[in-house]
């Protein structure tokens, strides 16, 4: 009898989809690296520190759909921009106050806040699946709908210090330091979250990283 054993082992191949590397990522479902996403931008799920066209996840300073200073996003946010709320202004909120239904403002949010979030997807420091520090999908600290830091390519949203619904320190529904909230929060506290903590469902993040 003749036994033939044949193996082909390729130890130098990496065909991964879910992993990241420090500084770049061409991912589908997972997260981003500290400095960049898929070539500085991605149309999937990842984010990078400087720009992203993402859908789901977030990284330090950027969010699922946003990046620091500019974003053409749909859902999520990044450091300095958010899909729903921002530092000092929000779709329905402003600095320290909100008449929110779903989202929040600086330090608190029904969905997210600076350092805390009640997120569903994933979050990062200063950004959330719905909000981020300094800008929002409807508002931003200087820009909104698809905001960038200080400028925006908005549709019905806001710009620096003012918003379609809100403005810095005041809002279409709220004003500085006060709110007519329903189930959400105010400065430093949240219906779901508080400053530095979160009541998340899906994944959570930590300073500069996310739990995807």
From Swiss-Prot:
| Composition skew (Basic and acidic residues), residue ranges | 1-20
State the source organism's domain of life: Eukaryota
Entry keyword Repeat = yes
- Name the residue ranges with Low complexity bias: 32-53, 78-119, 158-201
Cellular compartments annotated: Secreted, Cell wall
The UniProt disruption phenotype note reads: leads to reduced flocculation stimulated by 3-aminotriazole-induced amino acid starvation.
> Which GO biological process entries does UniProt record here?
cellular response to oxidative stress; cellular response to starvation; cellular response to stress; filamentous growth; filamentous growth of a population of unicellular organisms in response to biotic stimulus; filamentous growth of a population of unicellular organisms in response to starvation
Q: Note the segments forming the sequence repeats.
A: 20-27, 32-39, 47-54, 58-65, 66-73, 77-84, 85-92, 93-100, 104-111, 112-119, 123-130, 131-138, 139-146, 147-154, 158-165, 166-173, 174-181, 185-192, 193-200, 205-212
State whether keyword Cytoplasm applies: no
Q: Which GO terms describe its cellular component?
A: cell surface; extracellular region; hyphal cell wall
Give the residue ranges for region: 20 X 8 AA approximate tandem repeats of D-S-Y-G-S-S-N-[DT]: 20-212
* Induction entry: Expression is induced during filamentation, biofilm formation, after UV exposure, as well as by benomyl, caspofungin, and ketoconazole. Also enriched in azole-resistant strains and in stationary phase. Expression is repressed by SKO1, HOG1, RFX2, farnesol, and in alkaline conditions. Expression is also controlled by the filamentous growth regulators CPH1, CPH2, and EFG1.
Family classification: Belongs to the DDR48 family.
* The protein's role, per its UniProt record: Cell surface protein involved in the ability to sense and respond to changes in the host environment. Required for stress response and confers partial antifungal drug resistance. Contributes to the DNA damage response. Required for the flocculation response stimulated by 3-aminotriazole-induced amino acid starvation.
Q: What is this protein called?
A: Stress protein DDR48
